């Protein structure tokens, strides 16, 4: 409606200009009529007519047209005068008079001399009319040019209106599309916000899970540290007890040595006194006895010096132990003070003995003849005491060697535990660093991302990486648990094993029962086969057939019967193995093979068919040519072996992870077989301290000879 109104308003100036042209033509026609033809119009009392003002972009400007009516007194003629104002030298507007009477040209208004002309038919009037025609023709030409300009402007306006309408339609369409797009974008934003909230909740859940796992790891680490600390405290207590016992024994032995020294000095005084007062023969005898006792005194002095050196050695060892444990400082200081006090007492006793010797020299010589027999008895008892002391010293040295071996084992285990702790600390530190880096990366990515699609993709990638890390952490925990389990299997039997081993034993109890039944059947068949082999070769085949027939008839139905039958046949058809090649000696353990090149020790265990033989608490000791020793003890809980079994001890390597091992043990001590190997002694010690010894040759391989039979076996 607005566009139609605009078009009507814009078309009105053209119509007014056409009406004006028609009026001007009619006016020229009326001027050629006689004078008396008059144009009459209805009178209107000063009613101004206003024209529609039109605006154009280039040439048309605002114009105001005023129409005035003037009436003459004689003929009542209404005259209209138009005045137009033009700015900037262009036609700005056109007049549209109210068509009520035929207008006349108001020339007399501008030329006052024309108003005095008498009649219209005068020649001045005709000239005036001619001028008016010229003016009208000029006005017509101007109006035509103005009309052309108006038409061109109107066409341009119509074009612009059409363009405006097209643009308006396009804008409305684009606005609708933008509104639809904005609605879609708002929906997408809502969906993405929901997805983002879900992802953030998932991320928080994952972070909580990681925190819980970290707390579990920390708890496990604290438990392991407590266990290690308890084991270390136990080892320190055992070491302190052993050292205190040794020190007490050393003090007692020193006291006995001091008593013997005092007795020797007393005897020396007797001899010297009798030598002075007696005859020459007795003097010679006493001199010989004196020299002999002097040699013994020197020996005892050497023993004292060696004991002093041992005391110094113990002091040095105590000082070294003082660096490793703070709890031993007070005890070591007390022991050092006791040793110094004893040394002072020894010196005081020596001084007092020397004084007493000077005082009692005369008295002792008088009693010499009476005590010669007693002296001989004392010498004999002294020799016996000497032998007893030597045996005690040997036992003490053996105990010290065992303690050193145990200390080496404990040090190896402590080193392994420290390595495991460092590995766990490193893994926990790396995980913490990775978590912090992932958090930083996630923050940067959340800040740098501009589109929600990219955020979702990155969050999914982060979740996948966290899942992978969780999986890797779980595998790492399983691996560390298996390593701890393998380490606990190698711990000294005096230290109690973890409860996990008992639970694992309960889990595999059913499997062990089936395995024991199968081994029992096989061992019976082997025993029967060995007995038959000693009698006759033909009897062996008959025994095999009978044993296989009995096992097939008495075995269970299904797959278990077929497998046991096959196992029995296989065991009966292998007479050349290491278990069948030697005679069966129940309740014995012997060396079968010692190979220093491939680093393993193979033992042959002969267990009773009823109760079996367990090698728990048995020990292996390797003595190098330079005197250094290393020991390995079999752990508790080893099932008894029935029949002839081969047990292998691998040295210098840890227990393999994820692979079951049967009758195999692992001694993690490294550099056990370093050159030179020749002369290395390998000892097998039973719980009752019975020892079997093997010496390695130059090639480092010892193999039990086939004819030896029982030469290296330890009979229980």
Swiss-Prot record:
It is found in: Nucleus lamina; Nucleus envelope; Nucleus inner membrane. GO terms for biological process: centrosome cycle; centrosome localization; chromatin organization. Residues 1-10, 35-45 have a biased composition (Basic residues). Residues 130-450 form a coiled coil. Keywords: Coiled coil, Intermediate filament, Membrane, Nucleus. SUPFAM superfamilies: Lamin A/C globular tail domain. GO terms for molecular function: structural constituent of chromatin. Residues 532-545, 565-584 have a biased composition (Polar residues). A motif (CAAX motif) lies at residues 713-716. Disruption phenotype: Nuclei are misshapen and disorganized, with irregularly condensed chromatin and centrosomal detachment from nuclei. Residues 62-107, 546-564 have a biased composition (Low complexity). GO terms for cellular component: lamin filament; nuclear envelope; nuclear inner membrane; nuclear lamina. Lamins are intermediate filament proteins that assemble into a filamentous meshwork, and which constitute the major components of the nuclear lamina, a fibrous layer on the nucleoplasmic side of the inner nuclear membrane. Lamins provide a framework for the nuclear envelope, bridging the nuclear envelope and chromatin, thereby playing an important role in nuclear assembly, chromatin organization, nuclear membrane and telomere dynamics. Homodimer. Lamin dimers then assemble into dimeric head-to-tail polymers. Ultimately, two head-to-tail polymers assemble laterally into a protofilament with a uniformly shaped rod of 3.5 nm in diameter. This is Lamin-like protein. It comes from Dictyostelium discoideum. The gene is lmnB.
